[in-house]
């Protein structure tokens, strides 16, 4: 089964100080054990790198790049995903709903991905399921 991995989950896995770190690390481990097809977008990678570099420095970016990214497929946001995401963000008219989230939703729908590993309520609001079946 394919599982989308959001920036919020990536940050929680990477940062031992994150309030969701223990849950994120356990979930990530279970997803790997179950050989889930983990997918993120190039936009989420960019967002994660920017946040990790700012908060923790380049050694943490290296760790992300060498240790975490190799087990996650990167799906590239296409022009139609970007356009759909921008339209959804502007239509929603909610400051806290980002272009990265909206393009992720568009890509997930295009690829038929129903499950998301996240700590962001917007994925639930959009009807996506938790990363692991109950």
Residue positions per predicted region:
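Short, well-structured N-terminal submotif of metal-dependent ribonuclease cores
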Residues: 1-40, 53-66
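A generic structural signal for short hydrophobic patches within well-formed alpha-helices
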Residues: 10, 45, 82, 123-124
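Acidic catalytic patch
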Residues: 16, 71-92
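Short active-site oxyanion
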Residues: 34-38, 71-73, 112-114
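Beta-rich strand-turn-strand
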Residues: 96-98
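Acidic, PIN/NYN-like endoribonuclease modules and their adjacent C-terminal/linker elements
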Residues: 105, 109-134
């Amino acid at each position: 089964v394919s599982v989308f991995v959001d920036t919020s989950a990536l940050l929680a896995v990477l940062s031992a100080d994150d309030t969701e770190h223990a849950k994120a690390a356990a979930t990530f481990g279970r997803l790997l054990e179950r050989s889930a097809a983990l997918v993120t977008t190039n936009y989420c990678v960019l967002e994660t790198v920017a946040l990790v570099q700012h908060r923790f420095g380049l050694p943490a970016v290296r760790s992300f790049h060498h240790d975490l990214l190799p087990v996650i497929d990167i799906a590239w946001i296409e022009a139609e995903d970007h356009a759909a995401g921008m339209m959804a963000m502007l239509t929603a008219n909610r400051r806290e709903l980002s272009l990265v989230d909206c393009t992720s939703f568009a890509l997930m729908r295009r690829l038929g991905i129903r499950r998301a590993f996240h700590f962001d309520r917007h994925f639930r609001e959009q009807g996506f399921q938790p990363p692991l079946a109950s």
